[in-house]
UniProtKB/Swiss-Prot annotation:
Disulfide bonds: none
GO cellular component, one term: cytosolic large ribosomal subunit
Gene name, Swiss-Prot/TrEMBL: rplR
Assembly notes: Part of the 50S ribosomal subunit; part of the 5S rRNA/L5/L18/L25 subcomplex. Contacts the 5S and 23S rRNAs.
Lineage: Bacteria, Bacillati, Mycoplasmatota, Mycoplasmoidales, Mycoplasmoidaceae
Record NCBIfam families: L18_bact (TIGR00060)
Naturally occurring in which organism (per UniProt): Mycoplasma pneumoniae (strain ATCC 29342 / M129 / Subtype 1)
InterPro entries: Ribosomal_uL18_bac-type, Ribosomal_uL18_bac/euk
GO biological process, one term: translation
Keyword Ribonucleoprotein assigned: yes
Protein name per the record: Large ribosomal subunit protein uL18
Gene3D superfamilies in the record: 3.30.420.100
Function: This is one of the proteins that bind and probably mediate the attachment of the 5S RNA into the large ribosomal subunit, where it forms part of the central protuberance.
UniProt GO molecular function: 5S rRNA binding; structural constituent of ribosome
Keyword Transmembrane: no
Keywords associated with the record: Ribonucleoprotein, Ribosomal protein, RNA-binding, rRNA-binding
Length: 116
């Protein structure tokens, strides 16, 4: 039986495979990385293989990555992408469920003007 970490990695590989297969208009991918204590997000451009913007609870000097701080991270990344005039994105949960901290981050990003 596979461990939870292996299962999450396999789910994430499937998600990335689907994103690459269906992302024909080369939208930016918001990739969420969740650890036990912190949360971070990167805006990837898969066509050029570069990170356009990133934000994390560590970079914002937040104490932890709880739901309130995840909202702040979502607002920060949304502000950075709106400044770059990138509003249409694809959201990648990183193999985790769309629940809790990840949902809070996504909703905060939507409120600031991102479409996904």
């Amino acid at each position: 039986m596979k461990t939870r970490t292996e299962q999450r990695r396999l789910r994430h590989k499937r998600i990335v495979k689907k994103i690459r297969a269906t992302n024909h208009d080369n939208r930016v991918v918001l990739m969420v990385i969740k650890s036990l204590n912190h949360i971070s997000v990167q805006a990837w451009d898969f066509s050029q293989n570069i990170v356009l913007a990133s934000s994390s609870s560590l970079a914002l000097k937040l104490k932890n990555g709880n739901k309130d701080n995840a909202k702040l991270v979502g607002q920060d990344i949304a502000d950075k992408l709106v400044k770059l005039k990138l509003t249409n994105v694809v959201f990648d949960t990183g193999g985790s469920k769309y629940h809790g901290r990840i949902a809070a981050l996504a909703e905060a990003a939507r409120e600031r003007g991102l479409n996904f």
